[in-house]
Amino acid sequence: SSFDMIMAGAKSEMPGSIDKAPRHDEATGWSSTAISYQRGEADPPHHHVEGQLLFATRGVMLVQTESDRWVIPPQRALWLPPLHIHSYHLLSQTDLRAIYFSSSLIAECTSFTKSQQVHVITATPLVKELIAGLFSEDYARPSQRKIALLLLEILSEAPPLTMALPMPNDERLFSAAR
């Protein structure tokens, strides 16, 4: 498919693991980044060694994987499993929060049966506050680790929303949909 060709090109053009996630130490098991994007900016196909939770405090993004796309406004958060290739395009000025969870931290949350599935959840007030807590300097790292684990627990319990827009298999339609 066209996506496979894009992915093959991305893999050959990007160095190493093409993982841009900030590094974390295994003791904490998570890391985070906050980035502000202008409308129209994009991040080409890439993946991360960690699981990733994407959330926009402001703005809207379009996230694409090989088989689906998701429009993610501030009322939603998107879970991407470790090593899942994805790209995104910013549909408006967007303040993005990305939290990366190590495989070992994900494994500690034994109830997270959807950890290998891309899915969208509602960003409830609690989810938003937990995300904010991971970006706050008001909490020590051990407390933030507990916040990260609680966020994974909530991800495991939250019903996935059916927001995926399937990508067409026909090459011409796929090109038009991109």
What are these regions (language model features)?
Residues D4, C109-K114, T162-M163:
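Short, charged, solvent-exposed linker or helix-capping segments at domain edges/interfaces
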Residues H47, I121-T124, D170:
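Short, solvent-exposed loop/helix junctions and linker helices
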Residues S1-T28, G133-D138:
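A short, N-terminal "cap"/entry segment at the start of jelly-roll beta-barrel domains
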Residues K20-H119:
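N-terminal regulatory/effector-sensing and dimerization cores
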Residues S1-F3, W79, R178:
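Short intrinsically disordered, low-complexity coil segments enriched in acidic
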Residues S111-A132, D138:
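Aromatic/histidine-rich interaction motifs
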